[in-house]
Structures are given as C-alpha cells and as structure tokens.
C-alpha cells in the first residue's frame, strides 16, 4: 500500500515535498532518498546529492 502522505510536510501553512520528483517520469513519481543520492524506482534514474 502506498504511503505518499509520508513524502509531504506542512511548513508555514503550505504543503512541501520532502523528496524530489523524477525528471524522466511523470509528475507524482518521487525519488527515494539513499543518503548520498536520490534514485527513481520506476526508471532507474539516479541524481547525486551535492556536498
């Protein structure tokens, strides 16, 4: 079962995404946080975090 509610938080009365969305896939596909990188489970795209 999906837990998309865990990917959002409320700051100053506005909804903010915790993880980025995949640039290759459509909207609503979030990337997983793996510490030093973000990875898409759907297409495999990896985005490295900057230090």
From Swiss-Prot:
Protein's recorded name: Small ribosomal subunit protein eS31
GO terms (BP aspect): translation
Top-rank taxon: Archaea
Keyword annotations of the record: Metal-binding, Ribonucleoprotein, Ribosomal protein, Zinc, Zinc-finger
Necessary cofactors: Zn(2+)
Cofactor-binding details, from the entry: Binds 1 zinc ion per subunit.
Gene name of the record: rps27ae
Binding site for Zn(2+): 22, 25, 40, 43
Subunit structure: Part of the 30S ribosomal subunit.
Family label: Belongs to the eukaryotic ribosomal protein eS31 family.
ZnF (C4-type) ranges: 22-43
Entries under InterPro entries matching the protein: Ribosomal_eS31, Ribosomal_eS31_arc, Ribosomal_zn-bd
A GO term for molecular function: structural constituent of ribosome
Disulphide-bridged cysteine pairs: none
A GO cellular component annotation in the UniProt record: ribonucleoprotein complex
């Amino acid at each position: 079962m999906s837990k998309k509610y865990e990917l959002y938080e409320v700051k100053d009365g506005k909804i903010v995404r915790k993880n980025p969305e995949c640039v290759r896939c459509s909207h609503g596909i979030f990337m997983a946080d793996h510490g030093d990188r973000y990875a898409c489970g759907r297409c495999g795209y990896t985005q490295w975090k900057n230090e």
